[in-house]
């Protein structure tokens, strides 16, 4: 996925092979960046967006709110439909009347995200008004259509999308429930093994996932799993004719696997975990090189291996966990915001592998594991800002790993490094006013013990004095914590 040079936008969650896509093709964006609501998606790849803005009225000497309509090109990965809240950017003229391209669809979000955040309250109210008008208009059209009309599933699809977007803005759960019902009707009226069936099943699965996330109703989770499973079956039939629908298969496979992981976490049924791993691997086996969701899938596969280790206590699963995260790190762009988190996860996995494998892994291999873990944390440290909440964790973990390396190698430089990073982690936590947390008490204890070890090696009394000060502070904090709790 290309970096288009615009900060603050939500990147597309799906891939596409459209050459006119700013993210997956070669189209450059420039100039104006505008936000609005889709009021028409009748054209094949173009949409009409309604934009609201404020302008100064010299006649009345006050601000006036006005609207305008803009045509924009919508790449397949944006999936912009009527009722969606979108962001468009100016580009070279793509076709008659269109010099804008959709670069963000706030409505096409993952079911673990929050409701839509509209920039201004007055815009939110206008979007709600527009959506209610669209819903009312589409409902009237549906009533006027014959029961076997080919237009009926299209209108039901549009109605469901508008209702889902109204839920995103207003939080009205009834709109989401109605959206699920109308997507279900649309799917039931769509011809079997058609491309429209595939697309609508995925929309149904996403909406049922939203409903599960909102209500925690297990039946919604099961329905979403069934919808994605049916979407994959539909794709398998379509793929014998053409491979144009591969992005939809990748979406269905990833989302189905994610839901099966949720199901496993709820019921601890090993068959759900096995199915999730199968569909994650189906995604990896089918995804073209450079697919944007591949690192995410690799990370989730690593989590699945952790679950397998918890079930079987087989250390080989921890090795697989490390391999998957390492692959995710290797294919993630160095400028990606996800890279520091992946590096921290890699360091954590290596640490766990070290702790669990002390009695099973050769001594020289244990040292290599520690060095890899330390290097992973060091790389993450170089990529995050000084005010990041992850910095404290990194400082502490580097200290712990360096201490273990000192025990393995007897190199004093590792002990000094451990002490230095423990000091930094304590200072960082002090700045965040978390002095009495159990983690900080553990860090103080580690630092005091490390200073005593350093004193025994170098016989410098300053280390002993500092250690004594740390012990005194530790006593004070333990006393304060005890009184605070009581």
Curated annotation (Swiss-Prot):
One of the primary rRNA binding proteins, it binds specifically to the 5'-end of 16S ribosomal RNA. This is Small ribosomal subunit protein uS17B. Part of the 30S ribosomal subunit. It comes from Methanosarcina acetivorans (strain ATCC 35395 / DSM 2834 / JCM 12185 / C2A). Keywords: Ribonucleoprotein, Ribosomal protein, RNA-binding, rRNA-binding. Belongs to the universal ribosomal protein uS17 family. InterPro entries: NA-bd_OB-fold, Ribosomal_uS17, Ribosomal_uS17_arc/euk, Ribosomal_uS17_archaeal. One of its GO terms (molecular function) is rRNA binding.
């Amino acid at each position: 996925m290309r970096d288009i040079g615009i900060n603050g936008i939500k990147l597309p969650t799906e891939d596409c092979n459209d050459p006119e896509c700013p993210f997956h093709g070669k189209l450059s964006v420039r100039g104006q960046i505008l936000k609005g609501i889709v009021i028409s998606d009748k054209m094949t790849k173009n949409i009409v967006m309604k934009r609201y803005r404020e302008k100064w009225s010299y006649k009345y000497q006050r601000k006036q709110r006005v609207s305008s309509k803009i045509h924009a090109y919508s790449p397949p990965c944006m999936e912009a439909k009527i009722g969606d809240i979108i962001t468009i950017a100016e580009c070279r003229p793509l076709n008659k009347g269109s010099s804008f391209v959709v670069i963000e669809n706030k409505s096409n979000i993952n079911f673990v995200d929050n409701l839509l955040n509209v920039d201004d309250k007055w815009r939110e109210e206008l979007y709600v008004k527009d959506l209610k008008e669209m819903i009312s208009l589409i409902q009237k059209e549906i009533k006027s259509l014959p029961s076997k009309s080919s237009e009926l599933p299209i209108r039901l699809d549009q109605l469901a999308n508008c209702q889902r977007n109204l839920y995103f803005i207003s939080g009205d759960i009834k709109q989401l429930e109605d959206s699920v019902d109308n997507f279900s009707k649309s799917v039931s009226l769509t011809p079997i093994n058609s491309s429209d069936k595939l697309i609508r099943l995925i929309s149904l699965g996403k909406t049922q996932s939203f409903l599960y996330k909102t209500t925690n109703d297990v039946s919604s989770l099961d329905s979403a799993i069934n919808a994605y499973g049916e979407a994959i079956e539909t794709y398998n039939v379509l793929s014998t004719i053409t491979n144009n629908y591969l992005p939809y298969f990748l979406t269905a496979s990833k989302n189905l696997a994610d839901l099966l992981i949720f199901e496993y976490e709820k019921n601890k049924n090993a068959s759900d975990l096995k199915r999730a791993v199968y569909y994650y691997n189906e995604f990896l086996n089918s995804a073209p090189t450079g697919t944007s969701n591949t690192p995410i899938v690799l990370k989730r596969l690593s989590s699945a291996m952790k679950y397998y280790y918890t079930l079987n206590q087989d250390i080989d699963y921890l090795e697989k966990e490390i391999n998957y995260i390492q692959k995710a790190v290797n294919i993630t762009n160095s400028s990606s915001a996800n890279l520091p988190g992946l590096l921290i996860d890699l360091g954590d996995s290596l640490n766990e592998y070290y702790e669990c494998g002390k009695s099973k892994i050769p001594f020289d291999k244990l040292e290599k594991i520690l060095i890899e873990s330390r290097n992973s944390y060091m790389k993450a440290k170089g990529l995050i800002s000084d005010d990041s909440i992850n910095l404290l964790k990194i400082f502490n973990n580097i200290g712990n790993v360096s201490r273990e390396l000192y025990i393995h190698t007897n190199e004093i430089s590792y002990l000094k490094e451990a002490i230095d990073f423990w000091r930094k982690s304590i200072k960082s936590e002090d700045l965040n006013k978390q002095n009495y947390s159990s983690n900080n008490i553990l860090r103080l204890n580690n630092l005091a013990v490390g200073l005593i070890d350093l004193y025994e090696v170098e016989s410098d009394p300053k280390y002993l004095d500092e250690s004594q000060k740390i012990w005194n502070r530790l006593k004070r904090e333990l006393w304060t914590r005890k009184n605070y709790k009581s």
